[in-house]
Amino acid sequence: MTDIDTHPQDDSGDQAALARKQRLGRIQFRSWRRGFREADMVLGPFSDQVAPTLTDAELDQLELLIDEEDQWLYGWIIERDPTPPEFETPVMAKVRAFMREHVAAEVGKGIG
């Protein structure tokens, strides 16, 4: 007779990890394929390198940012245009720091 497992495994951790992986995949796709090259150059690498380290609350902030129009969003990132208070978040600060430390340095070298 076959033993029946009366103690089903708790796979909620696996499901949460899978859901997070899928969420990050959607964020990365949307960040790299914006249709506005300058925004792609900042948000694509940011989503690859930094987004996996963000908390769920920070990912919420990032998703709100990438829902915005490219021209507005890029203007806020480079601080050309005033950023509305609801988008002046810790994630926006991280995006700006990433741009200065990584993207601007590469562009300065002639890449991009």
Language model feature labels by segment:
Residues T2-L59, E63-G112:
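Positively charged, polar, low-complexity stretches
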